[in-house]
Amino acid sequence: MPTFVDQTKIEVQAGKGGDGMVAFRHEKYVPNGGPAGGDGGRGGSIIFVADSGLRTLMDFRYRRKFKADNGENGRIKSQYGRGAKDLYLKVPVGTTVYDFNTGELIGDLVEKGQELVVAKGGRGGRGNIHFATSVNTAPEIAENGEPGEDRVLRLELKLLADVGLVGFPSVGKSTLLSVTTKAKPKIAAYQFTTLTPNLGMVILPDGRDFSMADLPGLIEGASQGVGLGIQFLRHVERTKVILHLVSMDPNNGREAIEDYHTIRQELKSYATDLSDKRELIVASQMDIPGADKKLAQFRKDLEKESNDEPVYAISSVTHAGVSKLMNDTATLVEEVEKERVEEPKVVQKTKEYKYKAPQRNEFMVEKVGEHEFVVKGEQLERLVQMTNLDHQDGIMRLARRLKRLGVDDALREKGAVNGDDVAIGKFVFEFVQ
């Protein structure tokens, strides 16, 4: 069985747009031809696609950085550069995507084939055909391609199982899964045997079926991260029904009612309160001598608390009570599904996450040396980055735009004089009043 990976961190870099072209028409019968530089192509975006054939995030364990292709540069004769192909990355159904730095939820891939654009490719820069005016009929101005979005993401996988098996370690969850499905979990009589979730399909004689997940054992404090718990409580979020297994082994040194309440408290304390999910109480390991006496006490304790929910007594070793439990579980799953149908949820096939951009005029000036200044601002840095500085026309256009945005005034307020160095992003300019 492959290692189960249900949380990982990756970096995604969308492609840069192609640069616009500075070119002019040079044809035999067209003297003094005008501008003919084409636009650059758009950069490739990075798109997640939900794939029902994947079960883990293992593909991202050894490769953490993904980069889409850049767009082609514009060409002569007003020809556009070719746009880059988008990079599609397959993720398991049930993957939730967060911005690693802010913790913001970007998207939730819950349907097969659902897509999520997590990094958008930059637009292509405009060629000089766009900058001709009555004053400047032959502009040597073109834009560089826009940089693609660069993000650090946190991916979480939450299993999409109809039924989740919860309980203390070694209460028989893996054994129950193995005798009711074709899943082959590791089984042994010691704590934390199950270190990874196992998923199987229960198929009943009447044709009904449901998926069931054996989740690693919980202990007190799991919702706060004690033991393995919080890593796996997230998988319970998507289940329709919980089978809460309580061991009737009289030799484990624990009271059944205390075990039951401990797990219930952990479910309730989790961030999204899992205690409201439909639950069947299962008294497991009834084949062990003395289990009947412990079961009687457990039922008596529940009655004292006015808990009249039925308790299913089973033995996965002898299969006693398992058939009825599975039939009643299937019925409960159907009931929950009918309740959910009454509140239909529309799932977008393709979603593009819109990252929040700062205000266009938002920038700050910092004096870092006697004659050195740094201007910081994401939109401003992008403007400089997209300006083709190989031509004087482009430099003058940038200077005019910076002045209109108030950069010159802000520099003077900080004490900048002629000849001082001004850094914007990766570029350094000489300040001229």
UniProtKB/Swiss-Prot annotation:
CC terms in the record's Gene Ontology section: cytoplasm
Binding site for GTP: 167-174, 192-196, 214-217, 284-287, 315-317
Gene3D superfamilies cross-referenced by the UniProt entry: GTP-binding protein OBG, C-terminal domain, GTP1/OBG domain, P-loop containing nucleotide triphosphate hydrolases
GO molecular function: GTP binding; GTPase activity; magnesium ion binding
Localization per Swiss-Prot or TrEMBL: Cytoplasm
Main location class: cytoplasm
InterPro entries cross-referenced by the UniProt entry: G_OBG, GTP-bd, GTP-bd_Obg/CgtA, GTP-bd_prot_GTP1/OBG_C_sf, GTP1-OBG_CS, GTP1_OBG_dom, GTP1_OBG_dom_sf, OBG_GTPase
EC nos: 3.6.5.-
Keyword field: Cytoplasm, GTP-binding, Hydrolase, Magnesium, Metal-binding, Nucleotide-binding
All copies of domain OBG-type G, residue ranges: 161-334
Cofactor requirements of the protein: Mg(2+)
Biological processes per GO annotation: ribosome biogenesis
Domain annotation OCT: ranges: 355-433
PROSITE patterns assigned: G_OBG, GTP1_OBG, OBG, OCT
Transmembrane annotation, as ranges: none
Sections of the chain in a coiled coil: none
Xref: Pfam families: DUF1967, GTP1_OBG, MMR_HSR1
Residues annotated for Mg(2+) binding in this entry: 174, 194
Obg domain span: 2-160
PANTHER family: DEVELOPMENTALLY REGULATED GTP-BINDING PROTEIN-RELATED, MITOCHONDRIAL RIBOSOME-ASSOCIATED GTPASE 2
Family: Belongs to the TRAFAC class OBG-HflX-like GTPase superfamily. OBG GTPase family.
Quaternary data: Monomer.
UniProt function note: An essential GTPase which binds GTP, GDP and possibly (p)ppGpp with moderate affinity, with high nucleotide exchange rates and a fairly low GTP hydrolysis rate. Plays a role in control of the cell cycle, stress response, ribosome biogenesis and in those bacteria that undergo differentiation, in morphogenesis control.
Protein name: GTPase Obg
Organism: Lactobacillus acidophilus (strain ATCC 700396 / NCK56 / N2 / NCFM)
Lineage: Bacteria, Bacillati, Bacillota, Bacilli, Lactobacillales
